[in-house]
Amino acid sequence: MRSSICPAEDATKYAEELRELADKMANKALAKKESRFFKSLADESRVRVLKLLMLREMCVCEIMVALNLTQPTASHHLGILEKEGVIKRKKEGKWVYYAIVDSEILEGMNKLGLLN
C-alpha cells in the first residue's frame, strides 16, 4: 500500500500541488508581514504597553509613568507598534494619544495566551 503523502508515480504534479498549497497557506509576503507583527511583540515593554492600551487610550506621559519608562524609550516602543499597525495615534493639541487599532488583534493574542 502506497502512502498518499508522497505519491511517487506523478512527482511533478504532486510538487506543483505542494507549491500551490504553499502559495495559498504559507504565502511568503503574508508570512513576512506576520513575522514583523510578532517581532513587534517580542519585547516585554511593548506587551505591557498593549496591556495598558487594552484598558483605554493613553498619552505617552501616562505610559511613561505607568511603566517607568523614559520618554525616548516609550516613544521608541510606541513607534514600533504603530509602524506594524498594532496601535494608532491621535494628536490633540500638544498631546498624543495611543490606542489599539483593532480589537481582533487583542482577541488573537488572547487566544494565543499572550495576554494572561
Predicted feature descriptions by range:
Residues 82-92:
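Beta-hairpin "wing" of winged helix-turn-helix
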Residues 44, 56-59:
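Short capping segments at the starts of secondary-structure elements
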Residues 22, 99-116:
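Conserved segment of winged-helix/HTH DNA-binding domains
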Residues 1-40:
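N-terminal leader segment of winged-helix/HTH proteins
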Residues 65, 76, 82-83:
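Alpha-helical residues within the helix-turn-helix
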Residues 47-49:
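Pre-recognition alpha-helix immediately N-terminal to the DNA-recognition helix
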Residues 56, 70-73:
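Helix-turn-helix DNA-binding motif, specifically the short coil turn and the N-cap/start of the second
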